[in-house]
Amino acid sequence: MLKAVKSNFQVGIDNQFKLSEAATIADKSELDKKTLKKELGDLRQELAELQHQLFAEDKRSLLIVFQAMDAAGKDSTIRSVFNRVNPAGCQVSSFKQPSSLELDHDFMWRSNIRAPERGKIGIFNRSYYEEGLVVRVHPDYLKYQRLNDLPETLDEKNLQGFWQNRFESFNDYEKHLARNGTLVLKFWLNVSKEEQKNRFLSRLNEPEKNWKFSSGDIKERALWNDYMHAYEELINHTSKEHAPWYAIPADNKLYMRVQVARTIVENLRAMNPQFPKVEKKESEKFDEMRNLLESE
């Protein structure tokens, strides 16, 4: 079964993660812009090369999950880190409000059909983990799933066992993927409440960013503490050796992107994908084919 290598900001599997102790910004000594840009460029190039080998090998795959509060930088991080990767070997899926078709299936269905094929990198911009985050903060959403085992009162006390079952479903699914050749890496982009405020103000004050803002963002921000509670419990229950969480400081976007890229590259290095070897019967024809081409 595939397992991740240990990296910076990796959450342990001992159920001791404290969200209040997780950094949102690095030390100033680590924030030199020139140094970070150079490292990010090098990591992008290596990521492109490793992805090419993974695609050619066509035996294993990588699933990368991004979760965060609004304005943490999920979209821009995906765009930045993967900007040299061959689009043919990479697929990005965004998960928003479920459609009527998706609600007619179990809650993992829409994610499972978007899982990466062998040889590919799958990127989830939000994911099945919304079922233990936004749905937990807004338990009334469960009514639309037409489940037959819900308590009459959808409060935290009555739903505690329900959420434990969902955590088990997440873990079982990721273990199944790992056993079948898909490594799962999960990034929680940890933006501070103050930095989120600044980014929201930027979206309001700069016309070219207005489209990114919704009044609903402010309503969700008012539930910040509820979300932090949901994140802490979810991360503690679902960070595993085969599918770890990484709590990445997100107040400085460039630093965040470097940490994400570095973690992905370190894991692909450990996977060590190989170009397939040509069968001897075929390689024996190479000289003949070369001579035919050169004689044209």
Task: Spell out what each predicted region is.
Residues 1-44:
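Charged, amphipathic alpha-helical linker segments immediately N-terminal to NTP-binding catalytic cores
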Residues 30-39, 88-159:
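Conserved nucleotide-sensing/catalytic segment adjacent to the nucleotide-binding pocket
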Residues 46-55:
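Pre-Walker A adenine-sensing motif
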Residues 60-61, 119-121, 181-185:
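Loop/turn-to-beta-strand initiation segments
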Residues 66-82:
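Glycine-rich phosphate-binding P-loop
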Residues 98-101, 127-131, 139, 190-197, ...:
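Conserved nucleotide-binding/hydrolysis micro-motifs of P-loop NTPases
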Residues 136-167, 176-229, 276-283:
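A glycine- and Lys/Arg-enriched "phosphate-lid" helix/loop adjacent to the NTP-binding pocket
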Residues 223, 227-232, 236-296:
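NTP-dependent small-molecule kinase module
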